[in-house]
Amino acid sequence: MTPTPVPPATTPTPVHRRVEMVMGLPISLALRGPHATGVRADAAWAEVLAVLREVDRVFSRYRPDTFISRLGRGEIGVDDCPREVAEVLALGEEARRASGGAFDVRRPGVPLDTDGVVKGWAVQRAAHALATLEDTDLCLSGGGD
């Protein structure tokens, strides 16, 4: 019987992590590969944060000046909001139908609440900024509830 050669041990590629609070959530990014550090990674992370901060500016229920807060109070209509508001409300309607009404962003007697759909939508949208990091593994996460 001939022994099977064992390949030499390789050093695992390090994972580089970044975390910042945005939208009241810890937003974390883990990168591994040739573009995990450096100018490109820094620029991509900055773009991720810019996208999420803009989402917070439009959708935060905790700030009275946001479009979603003003819409919920009836001060403005959907047509007065950025187009992303209609997109997120449509996702909320899809979730309401799919859940048989158990999930509803427009529950009677409760302020308009898109949080259940907007967080995932926002992280997915922000992830597009990471497309420039070819051959680099990544994990973008928006923690919280």
Which positions does each model-derived feature cover?
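A contiguous, well-ordered beta/alpha segment that forms the leading edge of an enzyme domain
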Residues: 1-139
